[in-house]
Amino acid sequence: MHLLLAAGFGLLLLLLPPPAASKKPTQCQRCRTLVDKFNQGMANTARKNFGGGNTAWEEKTLSKYEFSEIRLLEIMEGLCDSSDFECNQLLEQQEEQLEAWWQSLKKDYPNLFEWFCVRTLKACCLPGTYGPDCKECQGGSERPCSGNGYCSGDGSRQGDGSCQCHAGYKGPLCIDCMDGYFSLQRNETHSICLACDESCKTCSGPSNKDCVQCEVGWARVEDACVDVDECAAETPPCSEAQYCENVNGSYICEECDSTCVGCTGKGPANCKECIAGYTKQSGQCADIDECSLEEKACKRRNENCYNVPGSFVCVCPDGFEETEDACVQTAQSEVTEENPTQPLSHEDL
């Protein structure tokens, strides 16, 4: 039994989809994280264990501590979690480089990220550059993609430097406006595109009067694009069991109330006609109480009538049974009525 369960469990594991592999950080991301933690460590230890008293002594002692190996060791100990194998591996491989920067290169290369990740490890590029040789992004390193997009591979040794434009912009330098946007300002290096009015497919300005072409669901009336009321069309766009609601640029078909046969709007007050079992009362479809009508709804003798939404139910009372034209009292119930407290005889048992 246990072997069967184990085999079944193993088969289930094989059939289950594999867990999604977590995306590993790139070498540049690992290097940047290490540098960020190093800089944070420097900030945390900047005035450690000094807090008032003999100022001259503090300045002298602090100056020694600032560049000491003790401080470096404290910073290095906080760079990687014990469970982060890749971080610890990188630190072990580059420990001597970090010590060299700390002891003799920090003054000439104050930007640790640039010296360590860009120049030494060649894992990253400076902002605005990309790829193995850290080439400038499209539009230049100062304002890649004219400031209106992202440079593929920006700051890394990856990517192709092409521009991925923000919403509203297009073109190799993200300087042109997409359909639905207009140019507010443009020169050789800068471009500002703003959204057209919702009624415009293309436009030259912000209002519905600036439309060059109307969007679908809108039509030009005089000098502006206005909403088309599809619900007012000669042939309604919705089915007979629905009503039409106009919205800007389109329409919505909503279901009629369950009591309606056709409707002009929401709820039982907007029914064109009522379904069977309902009738118009005070302007809306209401349930007919068939059991209270002058003409009896339940035709069989002794039968009880119960009203339900849109209909009624005919049921024989307790102690009665159905026949074709009446509810007939059962023999057992007749005996009980004649002798309500008399116990059953031995023969009856």
Swiss-Prot record:
Residue windows of the FU repeats: 190-237, 250-297
Question: What is the recorded name of this protein?
Answer: Protein disulfide isomerase Creld2
Could you tell me what reaction this enzyme catalyses? Catalyzes the rearrangement of -S-S- bonds in proteins
Q: What family is it from?
A: Belongs to the CRELD family.
GO terms assigned for molecular function: calcium ion binding; protein disulfide isomerase activity
Q: Which organism is it from?
A: Rattus norvegicus (Rat)
Q: What is its EC number?
A: 5.3.4.1
Q: Where is the EGF-like domain?
A: 133-175, 287-328
User: Span of the secretion signal?
Assistant: 1-22
Annotated InterPro entries: EGF-like_Ca-bd_dom, EGF-like_dom, EGF-type_Asp/Asn_hydroxyl_site, EGF_Ca-bd_CS, Furin_repeat, Growth_fac_rcpt_cys_sf, LE_dom, Nephronectin_domain
- What function is annotated for this protein? Protein disulfide isomerase. Might play a role in the unfolded protein response. May regulate transport of alpha4-beta2 neuronal acetylcholine receptor.
